[in-house]
């Protein structure tokens, strides 16, 4: 875990992205290679810290802070990087929300960018003709389960309100990994093999 000596970070950002890995198989089966996460280390800092579920995303967040970006910038860069290197932990095809507390202004903010129902959706699209609920997984599987993604728009809104670095600097690492590749974890390899055609 990286401990940063970044001064003047006076706010806390909590980012929860909505992601979905739909499967009927238990997770233990997906991890048939026996991947075990690195030993958890405990770290503390008075000024700031970056931690994510993937080391490349953590490095990107640290880089953004070291370039003078704020926690909002780092969270945006981390979110886009996770969409590439660990899609189940963050993706641009979903949505989420951000709860923000700015210590300097003592103001809380919430930005909701959850997925939205498509324009042609109806309130009874998951019901049978008699008005009873259709239990055939229509709301979770297939074309009727699709929502309009909100992640990119939500992260853009965070950037416009609170960001300090240019947008292109925040997404450049995600673009780099998408174009040039990266070493995947055994766990992601297992999932890709399990669901390959």
What is each model feature region?
Residues 1-10:
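Bacterial N-terminal signal peptides that target proteins for export
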Residues 6-7, 19, 72:
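Residue-level micro-sites within transmembrane alpha helices that shape
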Residues 10-20:
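Bacterial N-terminal signal peptides
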Residues 24-59, 71-72, 76-197:
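Noncatalytic scaffold domains of N-terminal-nucleophile
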Residues 63-65:
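Long, structured ligand/cofactor-binding scaffold of large enzymes
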């Amino acid at each position: 875990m990286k401990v940063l000596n970044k001064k003047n970070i006076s706010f806390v950002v909590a980012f929860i992205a909505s992601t979905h890995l739909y499967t009927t198989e238990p997770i233990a089966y997906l991890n048939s290679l026996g991947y075990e996460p690195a030993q958890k280390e405990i770290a503390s800092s008075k000024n700031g810290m970056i931690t994510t579920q993937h080391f490349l995303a953590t490095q990107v967040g640290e880089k953004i802070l070291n370039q003078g970006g704020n926690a909002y910038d780092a969270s945006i860069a981390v979110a886009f990087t996770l969409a590439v290197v660990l899609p189940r932990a963050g993706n641009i095809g979903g949505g989420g929300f951000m709860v923000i507390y700015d210590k300097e202004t003592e103001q809380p903010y919430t930005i909701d960018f959850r997925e939205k129902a498509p324009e042609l959706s109806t309130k009874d699209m998951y019901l049978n003709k008699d008005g009873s609920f259709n239990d055939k997984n229509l709301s979770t599987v297939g074309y009727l389960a699709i929502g309009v993604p909100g992640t990119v728009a939500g992260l853009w809104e965070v950037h416009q309100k609170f960001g300090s670095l240019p947008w292109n600097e925040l997404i450049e690492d995600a673009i780099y990994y998408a174009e040039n590749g990266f070493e995947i974890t055994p766990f992601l390899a297992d999932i890709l093999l399990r669901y390959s055609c």
